[in-house]
């Protein structure tokens, strides 16, 4: 009986040891994606069809009144929840702790310490928008002025 218990324990330990040799595979959305034709985006509209891959694509006027297209991260800068776009109020509202963000991504209410991050965005020769989520831009560091963080329309 003792041998059965000993062999069972050693077999279990061997299985757990072998299990650690194989890493956990994490399925994540692609770091870059095609966001369609530039001309399909309407002014002052948030396109949430890419929310599942972690981005909103937006066409709006910036602080210098330029018509631009940019991609915002769907991650709240407070605790990482996903804000919702409230079309009637023209703002992003985080359901976790009430942070509010303007269409530009700038925080104006709640505990979020900084604006939403922008992703790198570019246009192909055919006018197709490519969003690259591996490159992020933060407003508080002055990175929103980088020409890779927006497209002029």
Placement of each model-derived feature along the sequence:
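N-terminal pre-ligand scaffold of iron-sulfur
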Residues: 2-86, 119-153
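Proline-rich low-complexity regions
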Residues: 23, 95, 111-113
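Membrane-embedded segments
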Residues: 73-75, 82-104, 115
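A sequence-level detector of short linear motifs
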Residues: 102, 109, 130-131
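Short, basic/low-complexity N-terminal boundary segments at the transition from targeting/disordered tails
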Residues: 103-106, 152
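Exported/periplasmic cell-wall-interacting domains
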Residues: 107-115, 124-125
């Amino acid at each position: 009986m003792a041998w059965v218990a000993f062999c069972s324990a050693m077999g279990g330990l061997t299985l757990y040891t072998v299990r650690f040799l194989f890493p956990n595979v994490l399925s994540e959305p692609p770091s870059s994606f095609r966001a369609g034709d530039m001309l399909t985006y309407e002014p002052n509209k948030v396109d949430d069809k890419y929310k599942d891959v972690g981005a909103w694509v937006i066409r709006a006027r910036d602080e210098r009144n330029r018509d631009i297209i940019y991609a915002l991260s769907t991650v709240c800068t407070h605790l990482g929840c996903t804000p919702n776009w409230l079309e009637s109020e023209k703002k992003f509202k985080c359901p976790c702790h009430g942070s509010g963000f303007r269409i530009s991504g700038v925080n104006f209410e709640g505990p979020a310490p900084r604006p939403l991050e922008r992703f790198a965005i570019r246009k192909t020769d055919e006018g197709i928008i490519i969003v690259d989520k591996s490159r992020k831009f933060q407003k508080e560091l002055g990175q929103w002025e980088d020409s890779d963080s927006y497209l002029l329309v």
